[in-house]
Amino acid sequence: MSENNGFFLVLEGIDGAGKTSIAFKLRDFLVEKGFNVHYTYEPYNTLYVEALKKKYNEYRDAYLDALTYAADRLVHIRTEILPYLRRGYIVICDRYYYSSAAYQSAQGAPIEWVLEINKYALKPDLTIYLDVDPAIGVKRRKGLNTRFPEYEKLDFLYRVRENYLWLVDKGYMVLVDANREFDKVYRDVEKIVLEHLVF
């Protein structure tokens, strides 16, 4: 449990891991069980992110991206995540600052630095990392649009995965094998979440 009345759950993983599908199915299940549930995602306020990309694209690097997402995250926490938690909701967030740690570190920023600039962000009660081989994730998403095509190259995604595995090893999140069929992955996630929900 967090210092609030609710429960803050984060789902992490590369695109194609099944985060959003898992989040929606889990939300529906928890609502049926009588919980108040709110789904959200990051990046949150794309006006910040998109404006920076357009105006300062030639200056962009891992450090500028990480700081942009950190500012975006602060708005997200203050305007959406915390208000729902204070009302006793389970908040399911599709990506959080661990995405910045994994992706911006793969771009070249030290992973410890990315974690440092996010150290005062609200800590999740539980973070589940859906681990999928990038080749499988890319195959699952074939033909789908992406907001951030620069993050979809296979060699880059393997670096991202290594960063996620580092975060798992350091105890920041719980790993679920997402290479399997959807129902098996979902059942594991549901079981872990129910074990952590103590109201």
UniProtKB/Swiss-Prot annotation:
ATP binds at G13, I14, D15, G16, A17, G18, K19, T20. Its EC number is 2.7.4.9. It comes from the Archaea. The keyword ATP-binding applies. Keywords: ATP-binding, Kinase, Nucleotide biosynthesis, Nucleotide-binding, Transferase. This is Probable thymidylate kinase. The lineage of its organism: Archaea, Thermoproteota, Thermoprotei, Desulfurococcales, Desulfurococcaceae. Belongs to the thymidylate kinase family. GO terms for cellular component: cytoplasm. GO terms for biological process: dTDP biosynthetic process; dTTP biosynthetic process; dUDP biosynthetic process. PROSITE patterns: THYMIDYLATE_KINASE. One of its GO terms (molecular function) is dTMP kinase activity. Disulfide bonds: none annotated. It catalyses: dTMP + ATP = dTDP + ADP. Pfam families: Thymidylate_kin.
